[in-house]
Amino acid sequence: MASTVTQAAERDDPADWLRLIRSRRVGAVTFHRLMGEHGSARAALQALPELARAAGVEGYEVCPLGVAQAEIKAGRACGAQLLLWGGPGYPAGLMDLADAPPVLWTRGDTGLLQRPMVAIVGARNASSLGLRMARRLAEGLGASGQVVVSGLARGIDAAAHEAALATGTVAVMAGGVDVIYPEENADLAAQIAAKGCLVAEH
């Protein structure tokens, strides 16, 4: 299945991948199963209404092309790059996961996604000792060649990102690659986009 989807990532229209994963009742596991069964996102999209009908869901409609095109336009407008599972730049460390995100939006240095990574996450309302320890840990990991991954939250996440800016840091964002939360970390997010990498599924 992996080789089939990898080939599809190289030849498919990215809009079809977005339409498939944004369609109702299609999560990551279902996406990968459909791709394995049908060989391409477009073929899976064509099959979905009948598959839904067989499962008792009438009037099923796939995600419209215009929605996917609007997402691509918005992504490009904010300087983001779309990575497809199995395609160039997609993180090798996610490839073997059954529920790996089919698509990732990124801003920044995608080369960091191929390097060894360590996640540092913790309390938003961290103590001063906790913040110092997070910075020290992130600096040490960065110096040893590890990319520090965190979630751009206030507290431990922000401290880890800041300490690893010079050596490589990746922020995984829940709300979207163009949605900075909390707002107080907007400057940090801009620095990560310039020196590291922002990653999101939307």
Where are these regions (language model features)?
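Glycine-biased, small-residue-rich flexible motifs in mid-sequence functional cores and linkers
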Residues: M1-D13, L84-H202
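Short, small/acidic-rich helices and loops at N termini and domain boundaries
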Residues: M1-G89
